[in-house]
Curated annotation (Swiss-Prot):
<comment type="subunit">
    <text>Component of the 7-subunit TFIIH core complex composed of XPB/SSL2, XPD/RAD3, SSL1, TFB1, TFB2, TFB4 and TFB5, which is active in NER. The core complex associates with the 3-subunit CTD-kinase module TFIIK composed of CCL1, KIN28 and TFB3 to form the 10-subunit holoenzyme (holo-TFIIH) active in transcription.</text>
</comment>
<comment type="similarity">
    <text>Belongs to the TFB5 family.</text>
</comment>
<keyword id="KW-0539">Nucleus</keyword>
<dbReference type="GO" id="GO:0006367">
    <property type="term" value="P:transcription initiation at RNA polymerase II promoter"/>
</dbReference>
<dbReference type="InterPro" id="IPR009400">
    <property type="entry name" value="TFIIH_TTDA/Tfb5"/>
</dbReference>
<protein>
    <recommendedName>
        <fullName>General transcription and DNA repair factor IIH subunit TFB5</fullName>
    </recommendedName>
</protein>
<keyword id="KW-0234">DNA repair</keyword>
<keyword id="KW-0804">Transcription</keyword>
<dbReference type="GO" id="GO:0000439">
    <property type="term" value="C:transcription factor TFIIH core complex"/>
</dbReference>
<comment type="function">
    <text>Component of the general transcription and DNA repair factor IIH (TFIIH) core complex, which is involved in general and transcription-coupled nucleotide excision repair (NER) of damaged DNA and, when complexed to TFIIK, in RNA transcription by RNA polymerase II. In NER, TFIIH acts by opening DNA around the lesion to allow the excision of the damaged oligonucleotide and its replacement by a new DNA fragment. In transcription, TFIIH has an essential role in transcription initiation.</text>
</comment>
<keyword id="KW-0227">DNA damage</keyword>
<dbReference type="Pfam" id="PF06331">
    <property type="entry name" value="Tfb5"/>
</dbReference>
<dbReference type="GO" id="GO:0005675">
    <property type="term" value="C:transcription factor TFIIH holo complex"/>
</dbReference>
<dbReference type="GO" id="GO:0006294">
    <property type="term" value="P:nucleotide-excision repair, preincision complex assembly"/>
</dbReference>
<keyword id="KW-0805">Transcription regulation</keyword>
<dbReference type="InterPro" id="IPR035935">
    <property type="entry name" value="TFB5-like_sf"/>
</dbReference>
């Protein structure tokens, strides 16, 4: 029997897609379907979590030259 679920379509570049896939590998409850290289169907209740985690992960990778001046 076919089962329908409500989902949210996420469009992103492949690098962000890889981060979301890594998040899902830990939890296995975020992604419903990988549609192609730039589209994912995700659980609508997890969208805010995805945004929060992406902001956290991306902020770790931001270079701030002022940090070097403070540490010098």
């Amino acid at each position: 029997m076919t089962r329908a679920r409500k989902g949210t379509l996420v469009q992103c570049d492949p690098s962000i897609r890889a981060l979301i896939l890594r998040m899902d590998a830990d939890r296995n409850d975020i992604i419903y379907e990988e549609l192609d290289d730039t589209h994912l169907l995700v659980d609508p209740s997890k969208v805010e979590f995805i945004k929060y985690e992406l902001n956290r992960l991306l902020s770790e990778n931001i270079y701030n030259p002022l940090d070097e001046e403070e540490n010098a």
